[in-house]
A protein has these predicted regions:
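Internal active-site segments that recognize and position negatively charged phosphoryl groups
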Residues: 164-196
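Glycine-rich beta-alpha junction loops
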Residues: 59, 147-149, 180-184
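Active-site glycine-rich loop that binds ribose-phosphate moieties when present
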Residues: 149-173
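A glycine-rich beta-to-alpha transition motif near the start of alpha/beta enzyme domains, typified by
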Residues: 1-137, 185-222
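Membrane helix-loop-helix hairpins that form the core translocation module of multi-pass transporters
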Residues: 140-148
Length: 222
């Protein structure tokens, strides 16, 4: 199986295609893909990455996956699987890396100024990535992630308000929740010195799976 390794603002991604997975002898369904993602993303025994991204044509439909949004207007489809096997809707850094890989595989359109547009169907909707090429074969990739969502039922958040209280780091705090493709829980601190880096991962995991978030959430301390 041929797998590319990409990095965007510190997040790293392993990227391949449905065809590569099938040609390696696997049946493409959600259970198989989760197992493959866990193995590939493992930093000790696999390639090592934050996520596995998988490319397919815009007629993609496979067992166990949710319906993609914007698929009819897209050039291709992006499957996104976290290292732990969970399936988020979107990754801002991932979508740009994915679009670069997709263009290398022949997807997208090029205008008269050599700028490239790749339309990608995701679980969070159609995302359009534009690469503006500059000198020395460098390019700047940008994507419109759409407006942030604050309505609790759309985030989704089990609350009447996207401003919620949370007891964290021995203090009750006012925090804020939004969705920019995936849910984000923003928790203000008086100082970043409040964070114990040794226990940060454990704290983040506990908050990520808070029962108020039916689809889990990213956790951001500011």
């Amino acid at each position: 199986m041929h797998i590319g390794k990409y990095e965007g603002l510190g997040n790293d991604f392993a990227i391949t295609s449905v065809r590569e997975i099938q040609d390696s002898g696997h049946i493409f369904n959600v259970e198989t893909v989760i197992d493959i993602a866990k193995k590939i993303c493992n930093r000790n025994f696999g390639i090592g990455s934050d996520d596995l991204l998988i490319l397919d044509d815009n007629n993609s439909k496979y067992e166990g996956f949710r319906e993609f949004v914007g698929i009819k207007d897209s050039d291709c489809v992006m499957y996104l699987i976290n290292a732990d096997g969970s399936i988020p809707e979107m990754s801002g850094n991932g979508i740009r890396c994915f679009a670069q890989y997709a263009n290398e595989q022949g997807y997208g359109t090029t205008d008269s100024e050599n700028n490239i547009t790749v339309k990608v169907a995701t679980l969070a909707g159609l995302k359009i990535v534009i690469f503006n090429y500059m000198e020395s074969n460098r390019c700047m990739g940008k994507v419109d992630m759409g407006p942030a969502i604050f309505e609790p039922h759309l985030i989704p958040l089990q609350s009447n308000n996207n401003v919620i209280k949370v007891n964290v780091l021995e203090k009750e705090r006012i925090s804020y929740v939004t969705n920019t493709g995936i849910p984000h829980w923003v928790i203000p601190l008086d100082s970043l010195d409040e964070l114990n880096l040794d226990g940060l991962e454990q704290l983040g995991e506990a908050l990520r799976f808070d029962e108020r978030f039916p689809e889990n959430t990213n956790v951001n301390f500011v």
